[in-house]
């Protein structure tokens, strides 16, 4: 009985000491005291040592975390210093290599006009695919990288339409063009057409032209006032005599 009271007093002293230091008292201790789960000194020692071990482990973990973070910060600062030194000092440039003429993977956009040119109220999924295309440069500008072997490939995409506020999924087939082989070929430039000054005249002479001639017909009117005084004379004989006189 005296031993139990001694354990109880020692535990109360420990709790007061802990509360005096300012650390919060765990709720498990109050529960263990109320339940009388501490039956011996070994239980109390085990409990105290368990708390101390946990505290030691927590402190150890905190120290290791601090040291680890410090090591990371130090290594990061060293890396930054090395990068700064490399940026400030002249670096050795590697020799440039020509991008040779060969097939490369490119992204091809699947447009809606490849599926339906009469309707634009739909979506295509996927919106883009990968194709093989020739690319690269040649030794001079007179030759270009062009495909020498081409293969057509059929792929199936989804055509998404909205009908009565609901999506309708349909299947559509798209033809893709893949380049299998490439080669630098000579570019044949279109020759400019030169025209001489006489060529336009010859062209005009060869071209039949329709000429429209407009003639003006003048209508002669009798002079006014002539024979005006004889317009009421009906006798031709008298008229001749008068004119002959």
Curated annotation (Swiss-Prot):
According to the UniProt entry, which residue ranges have a biased composition of type Basic residues? 220-235
Q: Per UniProt, what is one GO molecular function of this protein?
A: protein homodimerization activity
CC terms in the record's Gene Ontology section: basolateral plasma membrane; cell surface; cytoplasm; extracellular space
**Positions of the propeptide removed during maturation:** 21-81, 195-245
Among PANTHER family, the record links this protein to: PLATELET-DERIVED GROWTH FACTOR, PLATELET-DERIVED GROWTH FACTOR SUBUNIT B
Q: What does this protein do?
A: Growth factor that plays an essential role in the regulation of embryonic development, cell proliferation, cell migration, survival and chemotaxis. Potent mitogen for cells of mesenchymal origin. Required for normal proliferation and recruitment of pericytes and vascular smooth muscle cells in the central nervous system, skin, lung, heart and placenta. Required for normal blood vessel development, and for normal development of kidney glomeruli. Plays an important role in wound healing. Signaling is modulated by the formation of heterodimers with PDGFA.
- Output this protein's name: Platelet-derived growth factor subunit B
Whose protein is this, by species? Felis catus
